[in-house]
């Protein structure tokens, strides 16, 4: 509909970035003021080193071996205790995301699996999924965040410097109003609900401000099973696998979530009602009895009209590096017809941070292109009866 087209155009503009956010989420940073991202769905990410220390001694306290720095690792055999610091061990607290998350697995060290033979006996780590009531120590809280506590034993053949670490994170657990339960999910509607209501990193809206009936309908539509391509496998209509940068505005992050599921969020009668764009039967017939103001019509413009759309997305099949999906395909009947009609290449490129499936990315490229070529909008002032078209 027209409302979803306008919302999509705003989100498209936000998706045109000069920087490469998708590649940046795999980078390790060192800071105590860096923003902590929110992970929805599943993504491979780097993290923020909030604690880095070297040591070569250990303490024995209460019969339990503890790292000198205060970490409490899983049980393992240690070298002989030394009275002289050797800086043989590097300790890192690597914050990955806001907690609580479902799981942190499949660690890679300098782009090699943690289990690689070159790292044998050199690395140990603890996983902290973190709910808001947990903390590391009384002095080092890290409360409410998901992080790794890691120890590296120095080996010049294995490590040329401070190791870069990435992990596969299944992110936030989400409340589902359809089942009144909380569990991990990659459903975009549930992600949007969480972002709108979360008081730590989201908008902090009261639950009463969300129409959970409408949101449940949207969530069910996102879960619809579709065939990804002729003769291919089936999958969900929409999923959300996003790393949200919490330094961005709430509006920008919400638009990122909405664009990935072709959603829009009208506000009516004191509540937000999530809608997922799609074909539907006509719901209202306008007559002159409903029109109480002037009519304005805006047609498509060359600056907003495309004959090729490229969507950049993080691809798990390419080790989560940025990949592209293009519509229409080069040499296709559609491309030939559009180029003949326009006489020049009109291309658009956007980044999608929520989609990690090639076929979902390609389908969204198709939808955005078709909308741009049928972008006539009409504005009229009407009676309150038209509110049912929200």
Give the label of every model feature segment.
Residues 270-273:
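Hydrophobic residues embedded in beta-strands of well-ordered beta-sheets
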Residues 279-289:
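Short, charged/polar, Gly/Pro-enriched secondary-structure boundary elements
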Residues 3-261, 268, 312-314, 319-321, ...:
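Polar, S/T/G-rich
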Residues 290-332:
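Metal-dependent DNA phosphodiester-chemistry modules and their immediately adjacent helices/loops
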Residues 14-15, 279-281, 305:
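Surface-exposed fibrous attachment elements
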Residues 57-59, 113-114, 286, 292-295, ...:
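Short, low-complexity, polar/charged sequence segments that are solvent-exposed and flexible
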Residues 376-385:
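Short alpha-helix capping/helix-loop boundary micro-motifs
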């Amino acid at each position: 509909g027209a409302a979803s087209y306008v919302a999509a155009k705003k989100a498209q503009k936000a998706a045109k970035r000069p920087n490469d956010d998708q590649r940046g989420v795999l980078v390790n940073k060192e800071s105590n003021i860096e923003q902590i991202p929110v992970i929805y769905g599943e993504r491979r990410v780097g993290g923020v080193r909030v604690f880095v220390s070297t040591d070569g001694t250990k303490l024995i306290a209460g019969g339990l071996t503890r790292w000198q720095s205060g970490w409490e690792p899983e049980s393992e055999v240690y070298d002989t205790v030394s009275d002289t610091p050797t800086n043989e061990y590097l300790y890192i607290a690597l914050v990955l995301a806001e907690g609580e998350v479902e799981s942190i697995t499949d660690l890679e060290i300098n782009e090699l699996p943690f289990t690689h033979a070159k790292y044998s006996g050199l690395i140990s780590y603890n996983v902290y999924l973190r709910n808001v009531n947990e903390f590391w120590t009384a002095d080092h809280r890290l409360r409410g965040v998901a992080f790794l506590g890691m120890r590296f034993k120095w080996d010049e053949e294995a490590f040329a410097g401070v190791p870069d670490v990435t992990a596969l994170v299944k992110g936030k657990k989400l409340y589902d109003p359809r089942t009144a339960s909380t569990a991990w999910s990659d459903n975009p509607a549930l992600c949007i609900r969480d972002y709108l209501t979360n008081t730590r990193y989201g908008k902090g809206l009261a639950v009463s401000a969300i129409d959970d009936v409408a949101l449940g309908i949207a969530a069910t539509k996102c879960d619809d099973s579709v065939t990804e391509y002729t003769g291919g496998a089936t999958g969900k209509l929409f999923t959300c696998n996003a790393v949200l940068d919490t330094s961005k505005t709430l509006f920008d992050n919400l638009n990122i979530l909405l664009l990935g599921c072709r959603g829009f969020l009208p506000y009516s009668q004191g509540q937000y009602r999530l809608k997922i764009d799609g074909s539907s039967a006509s719901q209202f017939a306008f007559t002159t009895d409903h029109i109480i103001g002037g009519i304005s019509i805006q047609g498509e413009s060359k600056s907003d009209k495309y004959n090729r759309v490229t969507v950049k997305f993080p691809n798990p099949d390419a080790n989560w590096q940025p990949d592209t999906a293009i519509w229409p395909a080069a040499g296709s009947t559609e491309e030939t017809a559009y180029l003949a009609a326009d006489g020049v290449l009109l291309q658009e490129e956007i980044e999608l941070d929520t989609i990690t499936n090639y076929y979902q990315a390609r389908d969204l490229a198709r939808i955005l292109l078709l909308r741009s070529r049928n972008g006539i909008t009409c504005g009229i002032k009407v009676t309150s009866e038209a509110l049912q078209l929200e």
